[in-house]
Amino acid sequence: MFVKNFIHKLKELKQKSLDKFANLLYDYGGYVYDRPCTFIICSLICCLLLTCGFYFKEHEKDIYKLYSISNSYAYETNETINDFFYKSRRCFILVESNVNLLKPKILRELQKFEEGTKDIEVDLSEINECKTNSELPPEQSHVAKELYKTLIQRSEENLKSGKINGSLFDYSDLDENGKSVLSLAGKENNDDTLIEGDNKNDEETSANNNNNEDDNNEDDNNEDDNNEDDNNENDNNNNNEDDNNNDDDDDEDNEEEDEEKQKSLREKLYRKIYEMLKKKKENIVLDENNPNVNFTDYKDDVFYPYQYIPPMLIKADRCKLQNVFGDKNLNIDLREASDGLKKQITYTLEDICEKKYGDCNFSSLFLYYEKGNGYIDYPIKVDNLDFYVNRRTYKEMMFKGILGNMVYEKSGSKYIIKSANAIMTVIPLLNSHTYEPYALAYEKKLIDYVRFYNLDDIIQDEETNDDNDPFIRFHVFTDRSLEDEVDRISKIDNLTRLLLLIGVLLIFMYALFNNVTSVLYRSKPLCAVMGIFCGFLGFLSGSGFLYFLGVKSVPPAETVPFLVIGVGVDDVFVILNSYSLLFMVKDNKKRIQMCLKDSALAITVTTLTNIIAFLISAISPFYSICAFSLFTASSLFFGYLMVLTFLLSFLCIEAKLEKKKRNIFTGTFHLFRSIFMKSSKKNKKENKENNIHDDGDNDNDEKKKDLSLEVKNNEDDYENISIYEWIHNLYLFEESINKKKKNAALVYASNNGMSSNLNNVNEDGFPNPSKIVSMEDVKKRNIKKDDAYINKEDEEGGGYYNKDDNKKKDILGKKQKKNNNNVTLVSKKGEDNELDVYYENLDEKTNDKYKMNNIKSSKLKYDNDKKDGAIINNRPSSDEEYKEEKDKNKINILNDVFNDITIKPNENILLDRGDVIKSSGYDSSYNDLQSSSLPNPSSNEVLNKTTMVYNETDLKDNKKEIKSSKKNVKDIKKSDMIHDDTYDIINSNNKNILLSSNEINNNSNNTNKFNNNSTELATKDTQQFINGHDKNIYLLSSHDNALFYKYIYEEPKGNIGKYFRSLVKNYYVPFLSSRFGKTIVYIMFTIIIAMSIYGCTLMKKGIKYDKAFPVDSYVRRFTTAKIKYFPDFGDFIEVYYFDKHFINKYRGLEKNTKEAASSFLYSDLTDRQIMNSPKINKNVHWENTNLQEELINMHNTLESQEFVTSVANGFTFFLNKNKSSLRKENPQEFYEIFANWLKKDFVGNLFKNDFVFLNGKLVAWRFHYFQKNVDDSEISSKWLKACKQITKLENHNVQMVCFHLSSIFNETDESIIEVTLINLGITILTILVVTAYIIKGFYSCVIIALIIFLIDLCIFGFMCLCGITMNIISMVILVLSVGFSIDHTSHIVQAFSHSMGRTRDEKMKESLHLMIGPVLHSGLSTWFVISTLFFSNKDFTVIFFQTLSLVLFFSITFSSMFLPVLLSSFGPLH
């Protein structure tokens, strides 16, 4: 009971809030109507202010932030690697040709080209990171500064003491505590290799270190002065922590967990005590997240090699040249230097490249020729293609990675290389924090140098291997290439601007096509144009607002204006559709208010659902999608506000023009007419008189066809009806006029005896077709076009009402004004007290002549009351009497349409008035149909006869229906048109068919099934008539019929959407409501759903990272060439091991601890949770033989993978070389052997920089492998998952991390399905809750949810069938599909639930009639504006177009076809 009451109260609250919101919109519409210009100016001013945010626009260039998952390890791993390992910046130069590049002539030119890379000069004005307003370097913590100075001093002491000779290091014996003391063996070697990261010779390194130390001394002294008391105060508190930290390595795993918990509690306690004692938080130098970090924890740490310094500690100001180029003695701060000075100082590759043996460590073909090892004029001869060493320079080479499409032959132990079509050169640059901006500037110059280098003249006469013209192409790829191309696609280039303009032009034409009609003053071209501008202004306002807040632009945001404009125009169609359907409301202000009340709620719901969908996407773990969703949601919101202010104001302006029967071009027309066509006052006066006498001579064509009725009583009742009532009454009226709307036209009656009618029937017992009274016969008898006859009637005393738009008074005797009317009533009192009624149809095709088509109706009997006669001939003395008398002569529209046809009194006939009109051949397209009221059927008076008015067009249309009237009478009988077994064929004689009341009463039971069972249109007159005669006949009063025809049935010409609605009503709705149509729809969508399910089985996920760049990008050309010529040397994958104690300890030195962003939509169980486990990567005993065996097995397993070509693992090389010496599992012996191998072995020397030792333990190491070049996102995305699984050694709690630049895409590929499904689920549930607040009934929400599910299923399946892979772009479109599908679906379901139909079929017809127009137009308009994206040069925009096209197609087809059929079968009836 409580739940029931709660639900009831909730429904009441919902209804009250909706009513309140609707009333608020109603009042707001009137407020805007009174001051539209004010709203236009205010909205434009606000939009202009928000657009100023574009001044603060920034582009996000960090590719890791753009494409990585926020809470997975790709971004974190990259940060960790950069903090503890030095990585080179590699520049790749690939030369491809269809000629042999190893010919001496070509090789010499290529050698000059390579030497040119060393001669590139870069001036310091190219350093963008050191501009005047550039940011200062991040400030280090006090402990980090102290540790950095200590490590520098220790390195200098080792240099002075002679411990370091060259670059070979050695381990001394381990001490008693198990800690190794690093020393040097003093081996003679000319290797000048430097410490990794600096890559300078020892003297340069020492100089740089001294400079860095001197620069930091002043800052350190200041910090010491300010914080000396703080550090002293915390020394005692940190002593216990120091002891605990030193003992962590010896604890067991369970003890470590307890110790960590206790440590965290102590840290919290110490922090509180510290803050209470100090009371000055701003003076705290220690990291707030680690208040117990102390220098004593780090001062005794010893690294191997001695010169190793964690990169995270090197934070020297890189804008000071003495920190970068110490050998140049330049004491210049680039932030303060002038541009002229910057341009005078240059540097070359020699200053920023990684060096080996004193030279830049190139990987190049020309290393083979150094120091006379070979000659260009002779073929290349090597003993190993995988690994070759120049015996004179000791520089290693991998010919399979240098020469592409290599052709060689084996001669003994030598390989003779004869030809190659591609040459790869790799230039390594320094990648430390200090050198990064200078390397970036050089890479920019290098890219320009390589891309525009040309050697076509050298190879013109060379023989090709493909019989095509010879060519030679230069490709380049650097670390900055990714950021540059991401930045380029983030900006709107000229092609995108052109596509946007074309898209706007297309949607502009489509909007005008749907909103401009033949009657210009009813057209709404201004609203169509301003609707497009509303979307564009919404984009400017929404994006500017986010730029104000500091949100950076991302590549997908480039499609936002296309999307927002397309969606914004949808609201225009909904509003104008509602406005056009309220044509019965004559008060423009009221019409605007009712329009806003009906439509604004719908567009509010659709806009809200779209915004919710994008906001939910904004919490996805992908930053680029998050930013894109924010931009779209913000733009849609401001676009919605612009519709309710800017667009509504222009609609009010055009509504006022429509009332004056003017349009936006009227002012211009009058201006030109006043200049070139000045008329005299006399002409104006004559024109005025002509307007009075000529009965509307200057009216437009639409006005000529309106029905002229002097009826105003109860018009407010028709103006206050809702759109749903209008459409319901329209279909009822259609049903009463043409109940089945078939092709036959027949009226028959039965006599008392069948024998008297035998001549009128055929042998089958059906009426003889030759005796059928067709509509053509009626017109031949009734239509008269003789103007002279009409004039004669006027001379004999007849009167007529003349129309005048400006005055309300009698003119020329008996002429009276008729508003909005071009059909005049001519009455004459003739003989036998009969009243002749005529209808004049003014056909004004010329200005000086008008024609009247008059139809003389049947003579109607009436009482000889003088008061009745005075109604026509004489105007009463008072207005009230005139009004009352006029009401008695209301014109009935629904009377019989046959002339001279009567029903004989004794015939057993049941006549439904709707069937009579239907059988007469009358169609709803006729404009003017009038007749008089029937008298009381209980009397024997003659029934009213039919008066009909036709114009030439109607006559032509009617001929088509008459031709189809020859349908078999048997079919007509099945259609309930034959009411009896006997027939009396009605001939063309002027007989009266009389129907006695007795027979009507006797046959009342049989009559009920033929009468209209609807009472929506019943009035007092009809109710009295029905109640008095057992409700056998259902009629409207003459007044109601006239008003109904005027206000409901006949849409005015030029009404927006009129012809489209007529097509829907006359063709589409009958097809969809038929059994055949429903069967076709069910079969078609069953096939579509089955294909979608099959398509889901073909799903592929992922996107190649080069596809994220434009089609014309040099990155894509480089990648294509690399895949072609070097298939076995694809991505260079790095695998890292980090000791968790080491990582956590040194990360505590950072003043601001980095916290990875997270999203609850995704959790990587294989990475984050495992790496956070307290057991992982702690206290690993590398001397354990079992662990060593697992490492070897891991290496073999990885090497056997299909995507791996070669593995370079220094650890396994060491284990295989010294396997017999490592069986004792002695730590001291293990590290001693390891040191000797790194020092003495040539292979070990190559891997020396891959290992980091701290205090006698291996705390970090890495290895590399190449994987195959595969242009398949599904295959390439598997490597990351496989690598993580293979490098996981569970038995020893070892988990390594695999990394490559493409991993930011690959890990996204692995998680995209999970994220998409979660995102879709949350979006659907949230939107359904919002929709349920608006839509009536729980059952309707279930149907909406089902349709959304089917739409998404079809989109997902057909994406796979079309070859579109699942990636972050297609994911956001799938989420967007929920918004689109809920828009279109909710429009139909809401119209269905609010419709007043008696059956599901009727409700379906009414809902389609009302809303299929806005649904179809909104989808097509959106598609037109995005269609131009197909021609974009960026893959993600093409994917956006393809996916969104599927979304729009299935959303429209399901909403306009499957959903109506489903509702007609299972929809909520109440």
Curated annotation (Swiss-Prot):
Per the entry, what this protein does is:
Facilitates cholesterol efflux from membranes in a pH-dependent manner. Required for maintaining normal parasite plasma membrane lipid composition. Required for the proper functioning of digestive vacuole. Required for the viability of blood-stage parasites.
GO CC field: membrane
Upon deletion of the gene, what happens? Repeated attempts to generate a knockout failed. Conditional knockdown results in decreased parasite fitness during asexual stages. Increased sensitivity to saponin, a cholesterol-binding compound capable of penetrating membranes. Impaired digestive vacuole morphology.
Which residue spans traverse the membrane? 36-56, 494-514, 525-549, 555-582, 588-619, 623-659, 1075-1098, 1301-1334, 1338-1361, 1368-1394, 1400-1431, 1435-1466
Query: In the record, what lineage is assigned to the organism producing the protein?
Result: Eukaryota, Sar, Alveolata, Apicomplexa, Aconoidasida
Q: Which UniProt keywords apply?
A: Cell membrane, Glycoprotein, Lipid transport, Membrane, Transmembrane, Transmembrane helix, Transport
Q: Which reaction does it catalyse?
A: cholesterol(in) = cholesterol(out)
Give the record's membrane topology.
Multi-pass membrane protein
User: Which compartments is it annotated to reside in?
Assistant: Cell membrane
Question: What is the relationship between pH and activity here?
Answer: Optimum pH is 7.0. Inactive at pH 7.4 and 8.0.
Q: Which family does this protein fall into?
A: Belongs to the patched family.
Sites where a glycan is attached: 78, 165, 294, 361, 1218
Q: What is this protein called?
A: Niemann-Pick type C1-related protein
Q: Which residues lie on this side of the membrane: Extracellular?
A: 57-493, 550-554, 620-622, 1099-1300, 1362-1367, 1432-1434
Q: Which residues lie within the membrane without crossing it?
A: 4-34, 664-673, 1058-1073
Origin species: Plasmodium falciparum (isolate 3D7)
Domain SSD, first and last residues per copy: 494-653
Q: Which domain of life is it from?
A: Eukaryota
Q: What else is known?
A: Mutations in the protein confer resistance to three diverse compounds: MMV009108, MMV028038 and MMV019662.
PANTHER family according to UniProt: PATCHED-RELATED (PTHR10796), PATCHED-RELATED, ISOFORM A (PTHR10796:SF92)
